[in-house]
C-alpha cells in the first residue's frame, strides 16, 4: 500500500503539477538527467529573459525562436531515430579480442541472409483500449520487455482466470511469440561439444544427427560423432500458454518420460521437397535408413506463425527488421525486402558450421535415437489446449548460412556431426522486440507440461542418453578436452499463473535429467524420480540437485533494494555476450507507461563455466547468482524467489491468517513480497530476496535463454558475473491472489561472458552519409513520447512556439508581478514539457495506458486562456460595444471585461492544480461538450453522440437561425400598421414553426441521412459497399433505419408545408394583437393545466408506488394482474389519453404560446424603436423562438414547469425585471435545466451519504465518513458549480467524500466501446474445432441482450410516447430487470418521435453484490408493516411508514412493474441427466439414424449420389452376404440394429430395423426411387448411418460406459466437427454435401427428437408422425451451434424457437446443457435511476482505476449499496472499468416503428399516401355507384380479393393449399379438407403478430383431428371483432382496396389478390392518409397453419416482398420465422424485422 501511494504521488500528483516530469528511479541516469535539464530549461529560460532583459517583442521573438529550434531538434531526432529503428539497419562491430580471421568477410556464401521467423499466438483483445503508443516491435533488440509490447491489461473487476483469458481468443492486442532462437557460433560449438559427456563403455554410441534437409547437407555430418547440439537459446513457453493446460492434462504428460531420443526437426519447405518420407528419424547407427514412426509422433507444438506483429500504436502491421553486415560481406541475393532495407547477415566466424535458425511453423520434432533400453519411437500427444497456437501466413525469411570457406579457430572433434536446425521455408519475419523464445522441451516450469520439445533434448541426447556433468571425475572416458558450452542457459521458471497444478515437468531429452522439483511437491516428485531413473540407467545422478547457499546473496538483495526492488536498466557499456551472428540485444523499456509497473533492472547475461573446474571455482567464488526467466506473460511467477527457510509456515490457502503464516504476493510494482502474520492479527511485510539453489550438474541444469534478456556489463569487482532479473509484466487478469505460489529454490551458475558483437544502427545524416548510433527503441520511448507523422511533429513544434509567444506576451503586458511571474513560467514550462513527455495517465484521461490526445490538452487550453485574457483586456480598453443592461446586470462595460480578464488570469495560474484534479477534459471531449451545450441551450438541439455529430447539429441550427434572422429583421425594421401583422412577419412565423418541427424530428447523427444521399447521388459506391457487406450475414438494421428516415423525410415534406401555411394564416390574422391582454394568460393557464395533468398526475397514478404512499398503481395496465404475460401489451385508455394530450400540447398549445410571445414582443419593439437595438432584438427573437419551439416538440414533460415559473417570476414577483415574455421564457428554460441538474445532484449526494443507510464497502469508507461532515459546505459549493457546468460529482474511492470531476456531454462516456461477439465468423477453424472459442456463458448470453436491443429499437420510442416508462428526458437512465436479464438503458438523444439509446447488459449470474441489488429492485415492499420500531400494519393498498420512508431515500424508483417486451425465454436442461443410461443413448442414436435417412430422402441430389460411380463402388462390399462393420465404437447397448451374430453392423440387421422408415421417406418423394432392401438407396443410407455413428464414436474417443466422452463427441458433431478417420468412410468426400446436408443436420435433429421423447415417448412410433415432426421442426425451429453465425442471425430475425447444445466451461464446472429458446413476451420491471448517480459513480470508477491505479478487484467502490445500485451501475461501465457482457452500439428508435402507436395515428403522411388514398376513395365511390346500377352484382368481388390494397401485407410464402384468408378473398370457395384446419380468427385485429401456439416448443403432435376451437390471436383489437374463418373487410381501409388494379392494387402491376394457386399477396406501396394502418396487421401465418403433410412442399418466400412499400409498423410485429435454411429467400425476410 505504501509503495502504491508513493508511486501515485510521484507519477500522478507530482507529474500533474509539473506537466509530466518526475524522477523515476527505475529509469537510467541519462533519461532522468535529460528530463530534469529540459524541464529546468523550459522553466528558467523565460523567467531569466523577463527578469534580465527589457520587455520587448524582439525578446519574445528570440524566445520563441529558441524554443522552436529546440523542439524541432528534439522531435526531428526522435522521429529520425524511430525511422532508423523501423529500417533496422544494423552495423555489426566485432570485439577487439576476436581474431583477425573472424573479421574477414565471408566469401562464397551462396545463401543470402534470411529473416528468422517468429511464431506468434495472438490472444483475445482484453479491451479496446489502444496499446501503449510506442512501436517496440520495430526494435531489433527488444526481446525481454514483452510487457511493453503488450497492452495494459486493465483491471476488469474480478480477476479473470488465465485459462479464461487464453480461451477467449480475440483480436491482436496480446502477442506471444514462440520462436526466434539464437544461432551457435563455432566457439560455442566447441564448448558445447567439450561439455558433452562421453558415451559409457557399455553403451553403443549413437551417431551424430546430420542435417535432415537433403538439399543442404551438413559438411560436418558423419558417423561416430558424439553430438553437436542445436541451440541453447530456447525460452520456456509463456506461462499464459502454460496456464491454459489443465491439471489433468499436465499430469497426463508425466508418463512421457521414457523416450530419450535426440530430436531431428525438419522444416516445412524441406518436407515439401522430400515428400511424404521427409519426417523420418535417423537410424541410431547413422545409416540414414528411416525408422517407422507411429501416428502422432510428428505433432508439432507450434503450428504457425503470424507474420504481422503488433505495433503499440494503432496496431499497425510492419515489415521485418533487416540486418546489416560488415563491409565486404556477401551481397544480399534474393532478398525479399525493400531495397533500402536490404542488408546482409554478418558471416559466422566459424567455418562450415551452419548456424541454428529460429523455430519455424510446421517444424516436426522427431525422436531419433533412443537409449539402449528404450527402442520404441516417441509418441507425442498434443493436448487440446495447444490448439491455441494457430497457424497463419508468413513472409519469406532471410536465409542465413555460415560461409563454408571459413576455418575454425580450434580444431573440431574429428568426425564431429552437426545437428542443423535450419529452416528455409518461405515466409518468416523477424519480429523485433516481441519474440519470446520457443520452448522445445518438456517444460521444467511448474504447471507447464506441454508436449513441446526443446533442442536441449537433442543437445543432450545425441549418440546416447544425455548425461549431466557430474562432479569432477565422475564421468568416464573424457577423451575430449573440456570445452565451455556457449550461451547462457536458463533455469526452470517458477510456477505459472495457474499454480494450482502441481505437476512434474521433465526434461525433453528423457528421464535421465531431473529438474529441481517444486517446493511442497517432493513426495510426488520422488515417486516420479524412481521411474525416471529406471528409464535412464546409464546415467547415475542424484534424484534432486543439491542446494548450495549463495554467499553473496545479501549483496544481490541489497542491489535489488537499492534499485527500488525493481531495477532500472544498466547502461550497455562494455563487452557483450556473443551468442550468434544475428544480434538481438534486449532493449529495456526505461519508462513505464500509465498504469503499468516500473521496469526492473536489466537482465545481464553471461555464459556458464567452460569446464567442471571452472564451475567449481565459480561456486567457490560465491559470486552473486540470479535466475533467468522467460519474458512472457507471467505476473504471478515473474521472479524466482525462495522461501525464507525450512521452518517457515507457508499459508496454503488465502484465508490462512494463523500466527506465523507467510503469504506471498506481488505489489503494484511487480515486486514479490511476503507478509507474515504476527500476534493479535498484526504482521509485517518484507520484500522477498533472491535466493537460489545450485545444482550439482549446473552446466546442464539451465535452459537456453541467451537472448531473452538485455545484456550489460557488471563491474569487474563482481568477477564478471552477470545478474538476471526479468521484468514483471502487468497482467491483472490472473488470479494471483487466491493461490499460494509454488516457488522452486534454484540458482543459476553464471560465468564471465565471452566478448560479443557490439551493435549499432545506421543513422543517415545525409544521403550517402551515415553514422553509427548505439541506442534502443524502448530506451527512446522511455525518454520521449513518440509522435508518428511529420504533420504531428510540425504541429507540436508550432504549438510549443505559440505557447512561448502567448505566454511571453502576457508577461510583457504586465499581468503578472512578483512571485506570480515565476508561477506563470511554471505553467508555461508544464505546457511545453507535456509536448515532449506527457503525464500518463492524466487525471482526465478516460483510458488506461498511453493517451496521446491528453498530451495536447495543456498547451491548447493555455493558448485559449492566453488569447482570452488578451482579448478581454483589449475589449475592456477599447469598449467597442455600448453597455447593455439585462435583468439588472450591466454587460459589455469596461468593468465587465476587466473582471472576466482577471478570472481567466487566475484560472491560468491555477493550471497545475486544475489538471491535478482533472477539472478540464481532454480536448476532443471539451469540444463536443461545448458544441452540445451551445446547441441544446441556445438552439434547442438534441444531444450529440460524437464530436462530428455535435459539429453537424450546431451547423444545422446555425443555418436555420441565419435563414430565419433575415425574415425577422426585415419584419421588425419596417413600421407595422395599427392592428395588423406584416406579411413578412407571418412568413417568419410560419418558417420558424415548420423548421423547428423538421429539426426536432431529425437525429443529430447524419450517418443514415448521408447513406440515403449517397445511394441517390453515388449509386456505384452504394453497390460496392453492399457487395462488401454480402460477405457477412446480412444485418437488417441499416436497411430499416434508412427506410424509417426516408419515411420521416417524406412525411416532413408534407407536414412542414401544412404547418407553415397554417401558421402563416394564424399569424396573419390579428388574433394575437387583438387579444394580447387576455390570450396570453389563457394559453399559460391551459398549458399549465394540461402539463400538470399529463406529466405529473397521470405518471404518478401509473407508477408502481404512487407518491410513495400507495402500494399499487391506480391506473394499471391489463397485464398487471397476470402472473405470466401471454401477449403484447394492450393499449389502455389512459395511454391513448396521454399520447393525445402530448400531441395537443406539442402541436397546438406551445406553438400558440411562442407565436403569441413573438408577436407581442415584435409589436413592442416596433412601437419603441429608440429603446431597442433592432439587430440584437431580431437575433434574440430568432434564437429564442427556435429554442423554445424545438424544446416543446422534443421534450414536453419539462415545459409546463418552466412556463409556470416564468409567469410567476416575471408577472407577479419581479415584473420590473421582465425583458419581454419571450426572453423571460428563454432564460427560465436555461435556468430550469441547471436547477434540475442541481436537484438531481443533491438527491444523489444525500441519498448516498444518509447515515441510516450508508453501506461501507471498505475500512476507508468508515474512516472517511466523519470527515465528510466538515466537507459539507464545500460540497454544496461544488454542487452549484457542477450543476452550472454539467459536471458529475463523484464519490472519492466510493466513500462519502465527493469531488467534482470534469465536464462531460450527455453521452458521458468517452470511449466508443461496444461488444464484439465471438463466433465462427471471426475465429479460425482450428480454434473452433479444438478450443471452442467464446464458449463462456457471458459471450453466449450476450446475444439475448443484442436481441433485447433490437426489440427496444422497435418499440422504445413508441412506449415512451405512450407513457409506459413514465416521464423521461435526455440523459435519463433506466434499469430493465427480469428473471435473468438485467440491463442499463441510457437515453441520450430525445427528439420528436425518435430516441437514441444504449443498452448495457449485465451478467446473468452476477456477483454476490449484484444479486443483492437485483433483489432490492425486484422485491416488493407492500408487505412491510413496520412503523419505526414496531409493526402496527398499514391501511389497505397503502405503504407502511417504514416502507414509505425507505422508498423516499433511494436514488431509483420503480416506474413500471409489468413492462412487456418481446424476447426469448431460455430453458436449459442438463444433457448428462438425459443421456446417463444406455437406453437413452440408444434412443438418441436411433433418432440420429432416422434423421440421416430423412435428410437423404429429402435431398434434391439423391439421384446424383445414387448414380455416382465412386460412391457406388465404395458401398458395393456392403451388399456382400456376411458383411458387417465391426468397428469397436459400435455396441449392442447403444445401437438398435447391432448384429450380435456378426458382431457389428450389417445390412440385414439395419434393414430389419429401419427399412420401413426408409421406404416411407422414399414414398414421400415426388420422384419415385427404388426402395428394396438391397437397392442403392438403402445401401447409401446404411453407409451414411454407419459413417455418422463412427464419426460420433471417433469424436467421443470411444463408446464406453463413460458419459463424458460421449457428450464431448456429441457436442463436437453438433458444432460440425466431423473427423473422418476410417478409410472405409472416405467415400463421403465424393460430395461434401453428404456431410453438410445429411449427417450434420441429422445429429442436430436427433437431439431435438430426443428432447421430444421425454414429453411424449410414443409420439414418433408411426413413420408419418415422425416424418411430419421432422419436417415441422426443420421449418420452424433453428437447431444450431451457438458459435455459428446462423444462430445470431436466427435470433435477430426473431425465429420462434431455437435449440442448441452448449458446453459450459466454468471455473468449477464442465457440463453440457441443451438450450431451448422460445420467442415470447417477457415482463420487465422498469426502474428509473437518478442520472447524476450514474454519472457520478462512473466518473469515480474512472478516476479510481485509471488515475489512482487501484487494482483491487474487491475494492470498496463496487460493493453493493442498495440505495444507489452502486454495484450494478459500476458493473455497467465500459470494460475494463466495468464488466458488462454486452454493450450495444448507439441505437435510434423511431416512433413510426411502433405498431400500436402507428395504429393510433394512422402512420406517416406522404405525397404517395395522399395520392393513394384519393385514388382508393375514387374507386370506392365508383364501385358504389356501379353496385347501385347493377342490382344483384357482387359488390365485394373486387375489394375482397385477397384483402386487396393495404390488407395484403403478408410476406409469407405461397402455400400449396388455399388458406382461410385466401378463400375469404376469392369468393366462396370452401375450406379444403385436411387435418388441423379449423376456422381461424381474423388477423386484422392483431397488434403484435404473435405466431399461433402451434409454434411453441415442444410442438404439439401435428397429425390428428383439427383443434376444437379457433386459435386465438392475442393483441389489441384495434378494429372490429374477429370473424371466424373470414378476413373481414369492414375496417376503415377494408372497402377501399383496389384489388387487381394494375399499379395500384398490386405491386408492379401484378394482382394483389391471393389466388387459389397460392400466389403471394403483394404489399401495397402508399398508405392511407387518415387510418391507413389502423388494422395493425400481423404477418400472415398461413404457412404455420398449413397441413403438415404439405409443409415440405412449401416454396420459398417471394423475393419481391422486401421491395414493397410496406411501412415498418404495418407488419404488426417482427416477421414470421425464417423458412427452410437452404432457402435463398430466407435472408430477404430479415429486412422486415422492424
UniProtKB/Swiss-Prot annotation:
Its main location: membrane. The modification Phosphoserine is found at residues 127, 392, 431, 505, 1025, 1697, 1909, 1955. The chain crosses the membrane at residues 33-53, 54-74, 790-812, 819-836, 852-872, 880-900, 903-923, 946-968, 980-1000, 1053-1073, 1078-1098, 1244-1264, 1280-1300. Residues 444-460, 1925-1939, 1969-1978 have a biased composition (Low complexity). Residues 305-319 have a biased composition (Basic and acidic residues). It is found in: Membrane. Residues 1890-1910 have a biased composition (Pro residues). The modification Phosphothreonine is found at residues 129, 370. Glycans are attached at residues 319, 1770. Residues 391-409 have a biased composition (Basic residues). It is a multi-pass membrane protein. Pfam families: Pecanex_C. Residues 96-118, 193-242, 260-517, 540-625, 1844-2034 are annotated as: Disordered. Keywords: Glycoprotein, Membrane, Phosphoprotein, Transmembrane, Transmembrane helix. Belongs to the pecanex family. This is Pecanex-like protein 3. It comes from Homo sapiens.
Amino acid at each position: 500500500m505504501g509503495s502504491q501511494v508513493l508511486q501515485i504521488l510521484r507519477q500522478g500528483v507530482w507529474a500533474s503539477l509539473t506537466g509530466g516530469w518526475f524522477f523515476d528511479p527505475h529509469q537510467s541516469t541519462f533519461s532522468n538527467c535529460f528530463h530534469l535539464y529540459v524541464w529546468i530549461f523550459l522553466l528558467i529560460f523565460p523567467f531569466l529573459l523577463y527578469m534580465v532583459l527589457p520587455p520587448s517583442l524582439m525578446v519574445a521573438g528570440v524566445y520563441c525562436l529558441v524554443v522552436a529550434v529546440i523542439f524541432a531538434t528534439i522531435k526531428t531526432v526522435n522521429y529520425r531515430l524511430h525511422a532508423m529503428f523501423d529500417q533496422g539497419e544494423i552495423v555489426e562491430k566485432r570485439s577487439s579480442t576476436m581474431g583477425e580471421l573472424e573479421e574477414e568477410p565471408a566469401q562464397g556464401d551462396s545463401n543470402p541472409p534470411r529473416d528468422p521467423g517468429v511464431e506468434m499466438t495472438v490472444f483475445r483483445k482484453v479491451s479496446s483500449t489502444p496499446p501503449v503508443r510506442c512501436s517496440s516491435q520495430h526494435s531489433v533488440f527488444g526481446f525481454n520487455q514483452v510487457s511493453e509490447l503488450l497492452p495494459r491489461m486493465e483491471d476488469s473487476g474480478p480477476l479473470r482466470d488465465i485459462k479464461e483469458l487464453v480461451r477467449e481468443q480475440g483480436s491482436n492486442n496480446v502477442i506471444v511469440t514462440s520462436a526466434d532462437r539464437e544461432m551457435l557460433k563455432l566457439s560455442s560449438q566447441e564448448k558445447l561439444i567439450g561439455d558433452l559427456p562421453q558415451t559409457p563403455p557399455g553403451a553403443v554410441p549413437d551417431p551424430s544427427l546430420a542435417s535432415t534437409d537433403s538439399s543442404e547437407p551438413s559438411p560436418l555430418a558423419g558417423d561416430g560423432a558424439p553430438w553437436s547440439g542445436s541451440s541453447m537459446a530456447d525460452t520456456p513457453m509463456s506461462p499464459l500458454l502454460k496456464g491454459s493446460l489443465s491439471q489433468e492434462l499436465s499430469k497426463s504428460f508425466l508418463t512421457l518420460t521414457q523416450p530419450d531420443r535426440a530430436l531431428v526437426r525438419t522444416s516445412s519447405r524441406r518436407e515439401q521437397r522430400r515428400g511424404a518420407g521427409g519426417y523420418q528419424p535417423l537410424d541410431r547407427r547413422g545409416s540414414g535408413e528411416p525408422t517407422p514412426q507411429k501416428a502422432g509422433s510428428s505433432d508439432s507444438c507450434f503450428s504457425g506463425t503470424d507474420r504481422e506483429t503488433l505495433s503499440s500504436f494503432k496496431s499497425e502491421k510492419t515489415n521485418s527488421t533487416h540486418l546489416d553486415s560488415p563491409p565486404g560481406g556477401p551481397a544480399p541475393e534474393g532478398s525479399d525486402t525493400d531495397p533500402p532495407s536490404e542488408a546482409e547477415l554478418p558471416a559466422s566466424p566459424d567455418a562450415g558450421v551452419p548456424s541454428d535458425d529460429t523455430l519455424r511453423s510446421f517444424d516436426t520434432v522427431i525422436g531419433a535415437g533412443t537409449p539402449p533400453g528404450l527402442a520404441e519411437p516417441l509418441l507425442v500427444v498434443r493436448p487440446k489446449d495447444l490448439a491455441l497456437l494457430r497457424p497463419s501466413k508468413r513472409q519469406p525469411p532471410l536465409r542465413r548460412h555460415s560461409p563454408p570457406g571459413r576455418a575454425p579457430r580450434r580444431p573440431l572433434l574429428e568426425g564431429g556431426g552437426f545437428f542443423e536446425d535450419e529452416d528455409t521455408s518461405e515466409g518468416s519475419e523477424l519480429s523485433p522486440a516481441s519474440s519470446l523464445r520457443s520452448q522445445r522441451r518438456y517444460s521444467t516450469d511448474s504447471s507447464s507440461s506441454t508436449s513441446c520439445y526443446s533442442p536441449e533434448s537433442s543437445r543432450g541426447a545425441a549418440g546416447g542418453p544425455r548425461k549431466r556433468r557430474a562432479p569432477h571425475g565422475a564421468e568416464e572416458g573424457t577423451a575430449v578436452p573440456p570445452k565451455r558450452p556457449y550461451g547462457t542457459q536458463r533455469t526452470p521458471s517458477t510456477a505459472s499463473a495457474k499454480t494450482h497444478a502441481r505437476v512434474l515437468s521433465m526434461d525433453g531429452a528423457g528421464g535421465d535429467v531431473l529438474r529441481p522439483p517444486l517446493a511442497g511437491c517432493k513426495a510426488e516428485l520422488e515417486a516420479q524420480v524412481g521411474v525416471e531413473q529406471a528409464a535412464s540407467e546409464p546415467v547415475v545422478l542424484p534424484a534432486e540437485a543439491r542446494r548450495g547457499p549463495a554467499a553473496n546473496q545479501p549483496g544481490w538483495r541489497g542491489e535489488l533494494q537499492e534499485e527500488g526492488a525493481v531495477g532500472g536498466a544498466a547502461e550497455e557499456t562494455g563487452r557483450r555476450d556473443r551468442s550468434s551472428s544475428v544480434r538481438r540485444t534486449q532493449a529495456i523499456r526505461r519508462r513505464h507507461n500509465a498504469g503499468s509497473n516500473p521496469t526492473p533492472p536489466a537482465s545481464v547475461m553471461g555464459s556458464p563455466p567452460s569446464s567442471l573446474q571452472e564451475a567449481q571455482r565459480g561456486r567457490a567464488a560465491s559470486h552473486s547468482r540470479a535466475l533467468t526467466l522467460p519474458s512472457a506473460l507471467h505476473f504471478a511467477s515473474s521472479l524466482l524467489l525462495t522461501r525464507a527457510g525450512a521452518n517457515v509456515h507457508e499459508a496454503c490457502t488465502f484465508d490462512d491468517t494463523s500466527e506465523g503464516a507467510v503469504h506471498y504476493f506481488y505489489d503494484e510494482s511487480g515486486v514479490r513480497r511476503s507478509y507474515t502474520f504476527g500476534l493479535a492479527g498484526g504482521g509485517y511485510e518484507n520484500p522477498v530476496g533472491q535466493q537460489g539453489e545450485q545444482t550439482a550438474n549446473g552446466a546442464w541444469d539451465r535452459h537456453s535463454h541467451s537472448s531473452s534478456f538485455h545484456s550489460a556489463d557488471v563491474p569487474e569487482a563482481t568477477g564478471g558475473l552477470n545478474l538476471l532479473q526479468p521484468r514483471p509484466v502487468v497482467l491483472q487478469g490472473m488470479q494471483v491472489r487466491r493461490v499460494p505460489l509454488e516457488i522452486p529454490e534454484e540458482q543459476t551458475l553464471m560465468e564471465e561472458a565471452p566478448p560479443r558483437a557490439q551493435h549499432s544502427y545506421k543513422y543517415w545524416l545525409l544521403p550517402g552519409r551515415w553514422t553509427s548510433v548505439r541506442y534502443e527503441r524502448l530506451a527512446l520511448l522511455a525518454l520521449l513520447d513518440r509522435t508518428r507523422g511529420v504533420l504531428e511533429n510540425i504541429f507540436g513544434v508550432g504549438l510549443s512556439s505559440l505557447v512561448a509567444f502567448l505566454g511571453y506576451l502576457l508577461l510583457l503586458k504586465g499581468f503578472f508581478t512578483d512571485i506570480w511571474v515565476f508561477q506563470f513560467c511554471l505553467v508555461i514550462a508544464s505546457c511545453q514539457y507535456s509536448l515532449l513527455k506527457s503525464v500518463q495517465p492524466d487525471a482526465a484521461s478516460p483510458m488506461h495506458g498511453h493517451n496521446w490526445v491528453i498530451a495536447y490538452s495543456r498547451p491548447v487550453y493555455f493558448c485559449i486562456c492566453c488569447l482570452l485574457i488578451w482579448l478581454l483586456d483589449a475589449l475592456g480598453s477599447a469598449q467597442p460595444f455600448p453597455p447593455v443592461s439585462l435583468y439588472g446586470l450591466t454587460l459589455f462595460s469596461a468593468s465587465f471585461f476587466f473582471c472576466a480578464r482577471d478570472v481567466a488570469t487566475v484560472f491560468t495560474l491555477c493550471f497545475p492544480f486544475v489538471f491535478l484534479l482533472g477539472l478540464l477534459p481532454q480536448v476532443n471531449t471539451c469540444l463536443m461538450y461545448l458544441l452540445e451545450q451551445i446547441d441544446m441551450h441556445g438552439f434547442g438541439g438534441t444531444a450529440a453522440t460524437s464530436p462530428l455529430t455535435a459539429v453537424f447539429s450546431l451547423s444545422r441550427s446555425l443555418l436555420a437561425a441565419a435563414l430565419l434572422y433575415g425574415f425577422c429583421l426585415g419584419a421588425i425594421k419596417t413600421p407595422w400598421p395599427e392592428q395588423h401583422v406584416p406579411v413578412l412577419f407571418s412568413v417568419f412565423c410560419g418558417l420558424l414553426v415548420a423548421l423547428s418541427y423538421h429539426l426536432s424530428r431529425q437525429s443529430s447523427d447524419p450517418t443514415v441521412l448521408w447513406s440515403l444521399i449517397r445511394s441517390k447521388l453515388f449509386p456505384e459506391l452504394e453497390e460496392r459497399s453492399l457487395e462488401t457487406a454480402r460477405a457477412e450475414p446480412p444485418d437488417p438494421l441499416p436497411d430499416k433505419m434508412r427506410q424509417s428516415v426516408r419515411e420521416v423525410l417524406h412525411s416532413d415534406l408534407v407536414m412542414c408545408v401544412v404547418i407553415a401555411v397554417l401558421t402563416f394564416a394564424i399569424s396573419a390574422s390579428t388574433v394575437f394583437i387583438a387579444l394580447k391582454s387576455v390570450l396570453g394568460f389563457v394559453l399559460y393557464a391551459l398549458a399549465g393545466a394540461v402539463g400538470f395533468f399529463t406529466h405529473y398526475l397521470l405518471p404518478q397514478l401509473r407508477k408502481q408506488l404512487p407518491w410513495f404512499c400507495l402500494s399499487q398503481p391506480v391506473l394499471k395496465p391489463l397485464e398487471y394482474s397476470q402472473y405470466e404475460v401471454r401477449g403484447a401489451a394492450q393499449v389502455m385508455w389512459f395511454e391513448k389519453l396521454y399520447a393525445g394530450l402530448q400531441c395537443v400540447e406539442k402541436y397546438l398549445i406551445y406553438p400558440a404560446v411562442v407565436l403569441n410571445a413573438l408577436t407581442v414582443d415584435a409589436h413592442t419593439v416596433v412601437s419603441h424603436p429608440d429603446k431597442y437595438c433592432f439587430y440584437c432584438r431580431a437575433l434574440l427573437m430568432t434564437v429564442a423562438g427556435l429554442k423554445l419551439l424545438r424544446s416543446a416538440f422534443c421534450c414536453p414533460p419539462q415545459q409546463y414547469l418552466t412556463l409556470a415559473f416564468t409567469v410567476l417570476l416575471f408577472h407577479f414577483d419581479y415584473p420590473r425585471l421582465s425583458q419581454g415574455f419571450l426572453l423571460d421564457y428563454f432564460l427560465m428554460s436555461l435556468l430550469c435545466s441547471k436547477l434540475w441538474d442541481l436537484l438531481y445532484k443533491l438527491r444523489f449526494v444525500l441519498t448516498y451519504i444518509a447515515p441510516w443507510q450508508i453501506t461501507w464497502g471498505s475500512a476507508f469508507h468508515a474512516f472517511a465518513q466523519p470527515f465528510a461532515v466538515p466537507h459539507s459546505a464545500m460540497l454544496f459549493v461544488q454542487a452549484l458549480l457542477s450543476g452550472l457546468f454539467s459536471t458529475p460529482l463523484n464519490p472519492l474511492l466510493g466513500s462519502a467524500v465527493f469531488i467534482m470531476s470534469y465536464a462531460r456531454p450527455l453521452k458521458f462516456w468517452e470511449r466508443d466501446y461496444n461488444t464484439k461477439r465471438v463466433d465462427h465468423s471471426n475465429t479460425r477453424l482450428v480454434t473452433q474445432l479444438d478450443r471452442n472459442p467464446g464458449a463462456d456463458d457471458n459471450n453466449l448470453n450476450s446475444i439475448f441482450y443484442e436481441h433485447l436491443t433490437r426489440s427496444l429499437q422497435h418499440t422504445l420510442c413508441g412506449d415512451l410516447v405512450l407513457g409506459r416508462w413514465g416521464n423521461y428526458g435526455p440523459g435519463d437512465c433506466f434499469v430493465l430487470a427480469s428473471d435473468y436479464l438485467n440491463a442499463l438503458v441510457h437515453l441520450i438523444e430525445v427528439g420528436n418521435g425518435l430516441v437514441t439509446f444504449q443498452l448495457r447488459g449485465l451478467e446473468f449470474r452476477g456477483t454476490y453484490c449484484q444479486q443483492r441489488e437485483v433483489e432490492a429492485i425486484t422485491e416488493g415492499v407492500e408487505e412491510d408493516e413496520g412503523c419505526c420500531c414496531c409493526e402496527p400494519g398499514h391501511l389497505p393498498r397503502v405503504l407502511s411508514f417504514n416502507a414509505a420512508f425507505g422508498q423516499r431515500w433511494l436514488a431509483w424508483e420503480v416506474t413500471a412493474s409489468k413492462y412487456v417486451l418481446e424476447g426469448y425465454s431460455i430453458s436449459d436442461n442438463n444433457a448428462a441427466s438425459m443421456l446417463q443410461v444406455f437406453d437413452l443413448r440408444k434412443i438418441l442414436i436411433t433418432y440420429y439414424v432416422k434423421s440421416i435417412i430423412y435428410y437423404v430422402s429429402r435431398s434434391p441430389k439423391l439421384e446424383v449420389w445414387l448414380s455416382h460411380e465412386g460412391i457406388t463402388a465404395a458401398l458395393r462390399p456392403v451388399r456382400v452376404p456376411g458383411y458387417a462393420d465391426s468397428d469397436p465404437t459400435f455396441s449392442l447397448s447403444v445401437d438398435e440394429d447391432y448384429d450380435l451374430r456378426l458382431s457389428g453392423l450389417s445390412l440385414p440387421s439395419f434393414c430389419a430395423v429401419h427399412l420401413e422408415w426408409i421406404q416411407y421417406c422414399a414414398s414421400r418423394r415426388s420422384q419415385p426411387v427404388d426402395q428394396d432392401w438391397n437397392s442403392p438407396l438403402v445401401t447409401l443410407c446404411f453407409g451414411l448411418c454407419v459413417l455418422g455413428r463412427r464419426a460420433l464414436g471417433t469424436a467421443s474417443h470411444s463408446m464406453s460406459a463413460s458419459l463424458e466422452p460421449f457428450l464431448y463427441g456429441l457436442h463436437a458433431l453438433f458444432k460440425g466437427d466431423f473427423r473422418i478417420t476410417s478409410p472405409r468412410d472416405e467415400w463421403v468426400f465424393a460430395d461434401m454435401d453428404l456431410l453438410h446436408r445429411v449427417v450434420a443436420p441429422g445429429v442436430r435433429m436427433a437431439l431435438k427428437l430426443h428432447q421430444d421423447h421425454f414429453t411424449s415417448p410414443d409420439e414418433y412410433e408411426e413413420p408419418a408422425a415422425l416424418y411430419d415432426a421432422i419436417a415441422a421442426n426443420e421449418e420452424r425451429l433453428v437447431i444450431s451451434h451457438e458459435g455459428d453465425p446462423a444462430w445470431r442471425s436466427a435470433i435477430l430475425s426473431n425465429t420462434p424457437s431455437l435449440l442448441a447444445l452448449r458446453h459450459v466451461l466454468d471455473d468449477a464446472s464442465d457440463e453440457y446443457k441443451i438450450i431451448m429458446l422460445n420467442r415470447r413476451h417477457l415482463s420487465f420491471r422498469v426502474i428509473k435511476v437518478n442520472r447524476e448517480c450514474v454519472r457520478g459513480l462512473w466518473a469515480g470508477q474512472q478516476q479510481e482505476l485509471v488515475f489512482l491505479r487501484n487494482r483491487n478487484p474487491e475494492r470498496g467502490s463496487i460493493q453493493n449499496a442498495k440505495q444507489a445500485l452502486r454495484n450494478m451501475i459500476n458493473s455497467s461501465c465500459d470494460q475494463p472499468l466495468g464488466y458488462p457482457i454486452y454493450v450495444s452500439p448507439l441505437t435510434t428508435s423511431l416512433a413510426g416503428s411502433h405498431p400500436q402507436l402507428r395504429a393510433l395515428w394512422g402512420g406517416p403522411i406522404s405525397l404517395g399516401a395522399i395520392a393513394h388514398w384519393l385514388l382508393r376513395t375514387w374507386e370506392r365511390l365508383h364501385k358504389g355507384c356501379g353496385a347501385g346500377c347493377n342490382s344483384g352484382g357482387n359488390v365485394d368481388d373486387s375489394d375482397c380479393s385477397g384483402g386487396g390494397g393495404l390488407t395484403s401485407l403478408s410476406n409469407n410464402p405461397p402455400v400449396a393449399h388455399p388458406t382461410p384468408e385466401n378463400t375469404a378473398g376469392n369468393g366462396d370457395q370452401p375450406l379444403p379438407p385436411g387435418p388441423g384446419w379449423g376456422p381461424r380468427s381474423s388477423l386484422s385485429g392483431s397488434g403484435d403478430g404473435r405466431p399461433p401456439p402451434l409454434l411453441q416448443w415442444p410442438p404439439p403432435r401435428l397429425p390428428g383431428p383439427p383443434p376444437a376451437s379457433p386459435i386465438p390471436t392475442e393483441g389489441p383489437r384495434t378494429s372490429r371483432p374477429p370473424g371466424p374463418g373470414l378476413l373481414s373487410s369492414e375496417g376503415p381501409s377494408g372497402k377501399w382496396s383496389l384489388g387487381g388494379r394494375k399499379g395500384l392494387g398490386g405491386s408492379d402491376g401484378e394482382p394483389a389478390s391471393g389466388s387459389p394457386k397460392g400466389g403471394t399477396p403483394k404489399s401495397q406501396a402508399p398508405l392511407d392518409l387518415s387510418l391507413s394502418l389502423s388494422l395493425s396487421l400481423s404477418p400472415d401465418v398461413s404457412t404455420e397453419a398449413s397441413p403438415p403433410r404439405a409443409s415440405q412442399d412449401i416454396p420459398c418466400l417471394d423475393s419481391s416482398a422486401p421491395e414493397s412499400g410496406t411501412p415498418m409498423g404495418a407488419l404488426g410485429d417482427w416477421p414470421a420465422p425464417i423458412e427452410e435454411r437452404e432457402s435463398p429467400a430466407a435472408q430477404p425476410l430479415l429486412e422486415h424485422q422492424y
